[in-house]
Amino acid sequence: CLGCMTFGEPDRGNHAWTLPEESSRPIIKRALEGGINFFDTANSYSDGSSEEIVGRALRDFARREDVVVATKVFHRVGDLPEGLSRAQILRSIDDSLRRLGMDYVDILQIHRWDYNTPIEETLEALNDVVKAGKARYIGASSMHASQFAQALKLQKQHGWAQFISMQDHYNLIYREEEREMLPLCYQEGVAVIRSEEHTSEL
């Protein structure tokens, strides 16, 4: 999985260290040539420009059916406020698909746990996104194991689309996820995507 937080116009968003499109495209092309076919971005990376750059590069260098594209929803982008309400999720996926230039994403991930929105509202909206064909699967990121377990239980109870992946902070130094999150994911058959924001998830 190639984390795409590094790709984005430096004058957009909060990270002036990101690579603009002309510098990002050769890296994405080389990654594809090297066999990498999973690209993970987010609606908030560089105010949406990461999705734009990744989408254009993949259209030019790969066939859609040969790549896995994941994006995320939660953080504020433009006039879209932070959160995981139904309205925010439905608008965010449409905005992401427009920026990516795609009809669907393979995985739509919730970037954080939203303490201001009932989790049932979030999960039902995600289920509707899957039913509409705008995301094939859904994933989660950056939350406590107890929260993830609660969400998985509710999805089973209501027959909603279930999370198939968890992206959490995990590396050789920070191994807290081995205590609860990784055993939970193993038990539930959930794939783990290692996230290390300071190294752009690579």
PLM feature segments, named:
Residues 1-67, 103, 131:
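N-terminal binding-site loop/beta-alpha segment at the start of enzyme catalytic domains
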Residues 114-200:
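Beta/alpha (TIM)-barrel catalytic core signal, keyed to glycine-rich beta->alpha loops juxtaposed to Asp/Glu
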Residues 2, 24, 31, 39, ...:
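Conserved, mostly hydrophobic/aromatic
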Residues 8-22, 75-90, 111-117:
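Active-site mouth loops of central-metabolism enzymes
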Residues 17-31, 82-101, 121, 148-153:
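Short, acidic/polar
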Residues 52-63, 92-98, 180-189:
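Short amphipathic alpha-helices and their capping/turn segments at secondary-structure boundaries
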Residues 35, 101-104, 109, 134, ...:
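Short loop/turn motifs at secondary-structure junctions
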Residues 5-7, 42-44, 72-76, 110-113, ...:
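Active-site beta-loop-alpha junctions enriched in small/polar residues
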